[in-house]
Regions:
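Short, charge-rich, low-complexity interaction segments located
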Residues: 72-88
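Structural motif
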Residues: 18, 69-71
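ATP/adenylate-binding site constellation spanning eukaryotic-like Ser/Thr protein kinases
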Residues: 66-69, 113
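Periplasm/extracytoplasmic soluble domains of Gram-negative envelope assemblies
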Residues: 57-60, 68, 101
Length: 123
């Protein structure tokens, strides 16, 4: 399983034709204490870099964009009652949803962890 990152600070962990999606540790840190996550509906069809979900924190409200195209097949219901999990474990337990990817080759438009870390240094 490999992680890929977008310039908007979302990640996707790819396993076969599914991708688990969340926001990066960097994004979670920048947001501050997360107070609410608006999860997508299971069955929602999304396009790469299109709107997927939303997240609110003490500092800001932000949209979450889909790093890949496909259909949402699962959501992290834990976040409905404990959104702070995103702060505690943004790239593991704080995942947002799972997408059945319609075009797995789209990950080629994303960054590896190493490339993302280099990108962050340039911000």
């Amino acid at each position: 399983m490999s992680y890929f990152f977008s310039k908007e600070h979302e990640w996707v962990k790819v396993s076969g034709t599914t991708g688990t999606v969340g926001i990066s540790e960097h994004a979670a840190h920048e947001l501050g204490d997360v107070t609410f996550v608006e999860l997508p509906q299971v069955g929602k069809v999304v396009k790469q870099f299109g709107g997927l979900a939303a997240i609110e924190s003490v500092k800001a409200a932000s949209d979450i964009y889909a790093p890949v195209s496909g259909k949402v097949i699962a959501i992290n219901e834990t976040l409905e009652n404990t959104p702070e999990v995103v702060n505690e474990s943004a790239e593991e337990s704080g995942w947002i949803c799972v997408i059945e990817m319609s075009d797995p080759s789209e990950v080629e438009q994303l960054m590896t962890k190493e490339a993302y870390d280099a990108y962050l240094k340039g911000l």
